[in-house]
């Protein structure tokens, strides 16, 4: 076993780098004291959400309200002194300060009334902010303060009143803020600070993209969030592939957006040019019967003119047939995928207008394929090649999309482990016997955690491998497999029956059989085995998304004897009727783990104008027998390692192996 001095000598290169940040014994010792103090603070609050599906307004409101936590803080501070209506207004102000502030100011009859309102509001916000900041060090709160007004806010939040009058002191500062025309700015900054401090860490367990109107808004918000991680969903990886320039992924995401009349997001938000696709679609399919290609529409986002619907439907058909051709090509390139039964263009009887699905022949609902050569059905004609080239170029050159996908790669992964919780979107593929399913890729067998790790690594190839390389092509094909493959941990179903739903009337062909995982995860022993596979004790939790919990039918989100929590509660509007709710947030604080069940959100406009909040029901899953401290978390382990390194640095200074570059007045 090495002695302390031997360990320090071996680490001198690293310690010399550390000395750049702590150039003296005093600086290092001061940081040791601060870090050790952090270890004794309560653990920060973590929020877990999944399956946002582009529903930006509901997500923004839940993020702004911290899933109801902020309203709880308002009631704790003001419940005994302020009427319900005023508390609701104040909560809305915190959620939407820029939108709500002008409304509240307009109600003030004159300058004197406005000044009175300013004073009351600032003092109330300060009290609420002091409560939400109570778990944080003063240094941490200072770091969150805006530079323009940080000193004053720090004074308001942390002033002591042993020797002077609190009301007089606050009154003087607040009066000066109002007198100098800074009240609006301070109100907005306090609201933002309250939201910032209410939640320490945000976990998004997959599917930011899908049919919802503005996934780009969600990603913009997440990119500004102080601490977030993402576990990719199958809707996310196919967009990652599209951004990488994968033709099959591009066609897939466009097919989804067009089928829900959401291509405006693609064109206006990401700047993707669909003009060439529309021109080609009109040329070949403009006179077809487009009944089955009409998009699903949301009356809340209408109205839709016949011309709008036709444009969408004709592009929907064109991109779908292009997608079917490319699917066959990807399946041919990747026999490891074992998806040969999905090459439907080779299974069509062109003379009879039928298709073979699952060994049976079915009539097709649409038999117009003007761009398909029956002798070579997967070949692209010259027009399709041009359109595809333009689309790939447009996706690759979309600056905003590239920023979003780089963020997904930087903050995302197939699974994540933190503070005893295992997070993943879809499934750990299993057999009917309850063992981990084994699949072979590139000549090697993978199952359980090894399969998840392999999927993560190969997904990154698709974006980061050198341009034109076989590894990049392979990675992009695999991103598509993660979207819909039978043993994809992100999909977890036997097949994605897009073709059958469009072309075959018989509903029995539309079934997507769930992976056996979704039966076995009800068994506590299986959940414990999954946790053990990932190196976690049986007391840990699995946080899962992907499959909406049908609460209206009595289904519970708690599985496996409490070891697994499904947090897909149907954020997406289309699932509200199916689930009976509008999403979950799992909240893990220093005292409890609780699940908040959200009711449907009407609109941000109503929230601002009528102080309408999302109604949420809180269900305590576990109560800790003591308040969890930072030292008991993964962050605590990191901080202890930091303290160890800093102590080694101090010793290296004392031994003279590293020279101090600054002399501080200190006792060290």
Which ranges hold each PLM region?
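Feature recognizes metal-dependent phosphohydrolase scaffolds
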Residues: 1-668
């Amino acid at each position: 076993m090495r002695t302390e001095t031997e360990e320090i000598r071996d680490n001198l290169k690293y310690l010399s780098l550390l000395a750049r940040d702590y150039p003296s014994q005093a600086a290092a010792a001061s940081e040791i004291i601060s870090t050790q103090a952090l270890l004794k603070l309560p653990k920060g609050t973590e929020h877990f959400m999944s399956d946002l599906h582009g529903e930006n307004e509901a997500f923004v409101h839940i993020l702004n309200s911290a899933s109801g936590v902020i309203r709880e803080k308002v009631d704790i501070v003001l419940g005994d002194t302020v009427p319900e209506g005023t508390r609701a207004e104040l909560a809305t102000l915190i959620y939407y300060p820029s939108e709500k502030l002008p409304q509240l100011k307009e109600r003030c009859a004159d300058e004197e009334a406005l000044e009175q309102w300013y004073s009351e509001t600032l003092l109330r916000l300060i009290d609420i902010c002091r409560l939400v900041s109570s778990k944080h060090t003063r240094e941490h709160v200072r770091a969150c303060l805006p530079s323009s007004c940080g000193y004053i806010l720090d004074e308001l939040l942390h002033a002591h009143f042993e020797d002077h009058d609190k009301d007089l002191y606050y009154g003087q500062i607040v009066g000066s803020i109002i007198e100098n025309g800074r009240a609006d700015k301070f109100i907005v900054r306090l609201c933002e600070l309250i939201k910032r401090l209410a939640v320490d860490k945000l976990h998004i367990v997959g599917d930011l993209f899908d049919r919802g109107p503005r996934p780009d808004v969600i990603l913009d918000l997440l990119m500004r969030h102080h601490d977030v991680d993402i576990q990719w969903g199958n809707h996310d990886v196919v967009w990652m592939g599209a951004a990488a320039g994968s033709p099959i992924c591009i066609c897939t995401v466009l097919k989804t957006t067009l089928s829900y009349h959401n291509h405006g997001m693609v064109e206006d938000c990401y700047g993707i040019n669909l003009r060439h696709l529309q021109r080609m679609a009109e040329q070949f399919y403009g006179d077809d019967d487009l009944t089955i290609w009409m998009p699903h529409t949301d009356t809340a986002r209408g109205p839709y003119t016949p011309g709008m619907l036709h444009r969408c439907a004709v592009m929907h058909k064109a991109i779908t047939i292009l997608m079917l051709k490319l699917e066959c090509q990807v399946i041919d390139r990747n026999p490891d995928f074992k998806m040969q039964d999905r090459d439907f263009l080779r299974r069509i009887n062109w003379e009879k207008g039928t298709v073979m699905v699952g060994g049976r022949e079915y009539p097709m609902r649409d038999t117009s394929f003007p761009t398909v050569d029956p002798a070579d059905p997967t070949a692209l004609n010259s027009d399709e090649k041009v359109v595809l080239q333009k689309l790939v170029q447009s996706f690759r050159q979309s600056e905003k999309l590239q920023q979003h996908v780089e963020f997904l790669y930087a903050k995302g992964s197939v699974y994540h482990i933190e503070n005893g919780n295992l997070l993943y979107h879809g499934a750990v593929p299993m057999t009917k016997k309850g063992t981990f399913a084994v699949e072979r890729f590139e000549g090697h067998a993978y199952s359980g955690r090894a399969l998840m790790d392999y999927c993560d690594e190969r997904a990154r190839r698709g974006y980061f491998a050198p341009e034109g390389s076989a590894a990049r092509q392979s990675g992009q094909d695999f991103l598509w497999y993660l979207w819909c493959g039978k043993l994809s941990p992100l999909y977890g179903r036997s097949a994605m029956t897009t073709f059958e739903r469009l072309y075959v009337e018989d509903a029995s062909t539309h079934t997507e059989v769930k992976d056996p995982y979704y039966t076995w995860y009800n068994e506590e022993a299986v959940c414990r085995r999954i946790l053990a596979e990932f190196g976690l004790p049986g007391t840990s939790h699995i946080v899962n998304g992907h499959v909406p919990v049908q609460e209206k039918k009595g289904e519970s989100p708690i599985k496996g004897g409490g070891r697994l929590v499904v947090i897909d509660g149907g954020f997406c509007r289309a699932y509200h009727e199916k689930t009976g709710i509008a999403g979950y947030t799992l909240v893990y604080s220093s005292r409890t783990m609780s699940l908040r069940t959200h009711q449907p959100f009407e609109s941000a406009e109503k929230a601002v104008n009528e102080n309408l909040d999302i109604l949420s029901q809180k269900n305590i899953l576990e109560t800790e027998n003591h308040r969890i401290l930072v030292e008991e978390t993964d962050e605590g382990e990191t901080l202890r390692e930091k303290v160890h390194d800093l102590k080694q640095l101090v010793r290296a200074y004392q031994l003279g192996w590293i020279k101090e570059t600054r002399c501080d007045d200190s006792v060290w």
